[in-house]
Curated annotation (Swiss-Prot):
Provenance organism: Methanosarcina mazei (strain ATCC BAA-159 / DSM 3647 / Goe1 / Go1 / JCM 11833 / OCM 88) (Methanosarcina frisia)
Database matches in InterPro entries: Dihydro-acid_dehy_C, DihydroxyA_deHydtase, DiOHA_6PGluconate_deHydtase_CS, ILV_EDD_C, ILV_EDD_N, IlvD/EDD_N
Family: Belongs to the IlvD/Edd family.
Job of this protein: Functions in the biosynthesis of branched-chain amino acids. Catalyzes the dehydration of (2R,3R)-2,3-dihydroxy-3-methylpentanoate (2,3-dihydroxy-3-methylvalerate) into 2-oxo-3-methylpentanoate (2-oxo-3-methylvalerate) and of (2R)-2,3-dihydroxy-3-methylbutanoate (2,3-dihydroxyisovalerate) into 2-oxo-3-methylbutanoate (2-oxoisovalerate), the penultimate precursor to L-isoleucine and L-valine, respectively.
An MF annotation (GO) of this entry: dihydroxy-acid dehydratase activity
Sequence positions that bind Mg(2+): 78, 120-121, 444
Gene behind the chain: ilvD
Keyword Iron-sulfur (UniProt): yes
Names of required cofactors: [2Fe-2S] cluster; Mg(2+)
Name of the featured protein: Dihydroxy-acid dehydratase
Length: 553
């Protein structure tokens, strides 16, 4: 056992003395020491229940003969951080979370770990730590929130964000907006659609790092507590067998995850998190892999924000394993998972509890919602190194569009203009200097995109940015434009009125300005320098481009 280095032999008497001060007995000294890495806190709805899941995990560890030690990581709620300076700290928190887990685990020489995250950057931070440390690990994602129910229809956080735009457009009264505010977020769990947190939970299960059914088991469901307890039991077996994450996750596992991502219409943030995760596993996952697999993998389930269904429906229809059943002819079925079985074995054992809903919600390869997957990678003179769009959430009318640019150098300026009615049908909103270095922190533009949606402009206005989007964004919103403006990318050269060409089927994002004119602009181009201090200053110096996953050296 790894933990022998802190607890065996006469020279470790002082170490044992400190462990005994915490209540560890002599008998427990002989058992595996398991870290329970909990991201519980009081401010993130997706995390307010994780203390209860941690107790279930610890009970499972004890049942199996291990000794649990719980510690906590930080977490940022992207929804609360949205639309202001706080969002600059969301993506950078991913690496901080990873680093703190590494520090705790290496310092205390745990034999294995159970990771308990829920929300957007916290799940990838935990996964990246698993890849870097490569000790036996299993992930228990916290589970989705139940949807709200207002005016005889299901609602979620995006309903509220879009309600702000509708209110500003005079389509919603203040009382109606307040009703949405009060009733749309039902309690514990990650926001109720296929947004970033739930997408990453699905990626975790598809990679084989959580038990079957974990991704869609809801936060308030007793099934989630049972999965947590079973995960605690299972980690002790993984330690005994020395099955580590790098023995489970291979390049083929990432291909499986991307195919699931495409089938469920997942968040564009996977194009940041999966390459960064692959990097920690010693693998290279290029942006082009997403587009290649998207062309081969149809979109099979229509979930919020791009469709009418919620995670609740997805879970009842069979969840991730049910989608993998549909994709079985395309997947690498021989890939191992943390329960000791292969993907193929797991999906062959899946019992569909609600067959009618399963058929209704999860389409077949022969009869998909869209022939291609949820995400497309666009390139061209505006994005030489690539950009991404959630094509599953784009109205067919806007998949091919050319329009004049309205340029803003930060999200706040764009938001004011949108809410003031200055953005007109046909316009392409350009928000720049919001990339990993330029922000710094690569903020999500959900407030702006939700305002566009709420004001009824989804079918006539596009948005292009070197920032990124919430998993809740819908419409012709193209992000991760690389190189970013602060790195001298062409997006920094765009002027009001320039024509921009968007062609999603052809994967094109072009700035319709002559090379001669661009050279003139480039010769006098001087990106503004943003003075930042503290962690953001260190992050700005070390972060790489979005097309590499925004990894940090």
């Amino acid at each position: 056992m790894r933990s022998a280095i802190i607890k065996e032999g006469p020279e470790r008497a002082a170490n044992r003395s400190l462990l005994k001060a915490t209540g560890v007995t002599d008998a427990e000294m002989k058992r595996p020491f398991i870290a329970v890495v909990n991201s519980w806190n009081d401010i993130i709805p997706g995390h307010i229940h994780l203390n209860k899941l941690a107790e279930a995990v610890k009970a499972g560890i004890r049942n199996a003969g291990g000794v649990p030690f719980e510690f906590h990581t930080i977490g940022v709620c992207d929804g609360i951080a949205m639309g202001h300076e706080g969002m600059k700290y969301s993506l950078p928190s991913r690496e901080v979370i990873e680093d703190t887990i590494e520090l705790m685990v290496r310092a205390h020489q745990f034999d294995g770990m159970v990771l308990i995250p829920t929300c957007d950057k916290i799940v990838p931070g935990h996964l990246m730590a698993a890849g870097r440390l490569d000790i036996p690990a299993i992930v228990v994602t916290g589970g989705p929130m139940l949807p709200g129910y207002v005016d005889d229809k299901y609602t979620d956080l995006i309903s509220v964000f879009e309600g702000v735009g509708a209110f500003r457009a005079g389509k919603l009264s203040e009382a109606e907006l307040e009703r949405l505010e009060n009733l749309s977020c039902a309690g514990a769990g990650s926001c109720a659609g296929m947004f970033t947190a739930n997408t990453m939970a699905c990626m975790t299960e598809a990679l084989g790092l959580s038990l079957p059914g974990c991704a869609t088991a809801h936060a308030v469901d007793a099934k989630k507590v049972r999965i947590a307890k079973e995960s605690g039991e299972r980690i002790v077996e993984l330690v005994k067998q020395n099955i580590t994450p790098r023995k489970i996750v291979t390049y083929k596992s990432f291909e499986n995850a991307i195919m699931v991502d495409m089938a469920v219409g997942g968040s564009t943030n996977t194009t940041l998190h999966l390459p960064a995760l692959a990097h920690e596993f010693g693998l290279e996952l290029p942006l082009e892999a997403f587009d290649e697999l998207s062309r081969k993998t149809p979109h099979l389930i229509s979930l919020r924000p791009g469709g009418p269904n919620f995670m609740l429906h997805f879970d009842r229809a069979g969840g991730v394993e049910a989608v993998m059943q549909r994709l079985s002819s395309k997947l690498h079925l021989d890939q191992l998972t943390v329960n000791g079985k292969t993907i193929g074995e797991n999906i062959s054992e899946l019992e569909i509890i609600n067959p009618k809903l399963n058929e209704e919600i999860i389409k077949t390869l022969e009869n998909p919602i869209h022939a291609e997957g949820g995400i497309a990678v666009l390139k061209g003179s505006l994005a030489p190194d690539g950009s991404v769009v959630k094509q599953a959430a784009v109205d067919p009318k806007m998949r091919v569009h050319t329009g004049p640019a309205k340029v803003y150098d930060c999200e706040e300026d764009a938001m004011k203009s949108i809410l003031a009615g200055e953005v007109k049908p046909g316009d392409i909103v350009v928000i720049r200097y919001e990339g990993p270095k330029g922000g710094p922190g690569m903020r999500e533009m959900l407030a702006a995109t939700a305002a566009i949606a709420g004001m009824g402009l989804l079918e006539s206005v596009a948005l292009v940015t070197d920032g990124r989007f919430s998993g809740g964004t819908r419409g012709p919103c193209i992000g991760h434009v690389s190189p970013e403006a602060s790195e001298g990318g062409p997006i920094g050269l765009v002027k009001d009125g320039d024509l921009i060409e968007i062609n999603i089927p052809e994967r094109i994002l072009n700035l319709k300005v002559s090379e001669e004119e661009l050279e003139k602009r480039r010769s006098v181009f001087n990106p503004p320098e943003k003075k930042v201090t503290g962690y953001l200053a260190r992050y700005q110096r070390a972060v790489h481009s979005a097309n590499t996953g925004g990894i940090v050296d």
